[in-house]
Amino acid sequence: VGSELSCDEAYRGHLIENELASCTRRADVYERIRNCRIMVGTVAAISGKPELFRLKHFDVAIVDEATQILEPQLLGILCAGDRNAIDKFILIGDHKQLPAVVLQKAEQSAIYDETLLAIGLTNLKDSLFERLYRNCPAVHRSHDMLCRQGRMHPKVALFANRAFYGGHLIPVGLSHQTESSEHISRLAFYPSQPEKAGGSAKINYSEARIVAGLAAQIYESHRTDFDDSRTLGVITPYRSQIALIKKEIEALGIPALNRILVDTVERFQGSERDVIIYSCCINSYYQLKFVSNLTEENGVLIDRKLNVALTRARKQMFVTGVPKYLKSNPLYESLLNLIETQG
């Protein structure tokens, strides 16, 4: 369910409009939809097709990335209350990674209505997933965590696992997770120089050059199987730094590298690459506050942006930044210390 503009060409033939194009009678349309056991689409796309609920009953709805979806966005699906409603919802998400983007300040989206507060709805910026998760202890509902991860090599996952997940993450044991690390650096830090006073705080030429140099080395080591959509990605917090990194990479004269994704951590959530380079682009102490997204659980401080950035890589994770600024933050200091001893 969706638009051809946002659907990969390989799957456009399965879009509901294309599947129903050959139907000449309403009965044919009904039969085709009734016989379709699985429908896939974004929350917006499914909500925009209310006629589906008049034609078909759904036993289960699985909502992926549920922590990035606000409650009102789910209402159209949750409130289908007739006989053709959805029997059961499964919300899958990670509240320790980035939430939905809300432009309002927390004070503006805060809830003061006693009825809503009684059901745990304290702020409109929170997802239904978070509210239900927070309410579990109060209403004595059981909850658990999916611990097996098939993305990261254990050494790549080491910091995030210890700092944010209490050491509970267990590798599935896929081939890339069991590869030897004897001749490969899984986690490495490359110190950069801060920009001079008076310059833009949102660019760092030293880091851009480091990123380009690493990209060239990675391309050379993967020349025979380099895939711009799979092998390498670069994360950095500012658009200005993205443009600078792209310029430095373009100067290398390697066409394949010009097609790699260089973007913010928000745009990378849900994506993965074999190798990720993270350009922190912190040129002053105060910037650390703006590039973090902090939350706390059971007394443990969690930086959701840092967590996302460090969990995008399958095989290797490289970080570059100014050590003296990064070490002023306890989480970044712990990361650098771990890389120094384990990386």
Where are these regions (language model features)?
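Conserved helicase NTPase catalytic core signature
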Residues: 1-59, 73
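Conserved helicase motor core of SF1/SF2 NTP-dependent helicases
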Residues: 30, 44-46, 51-343
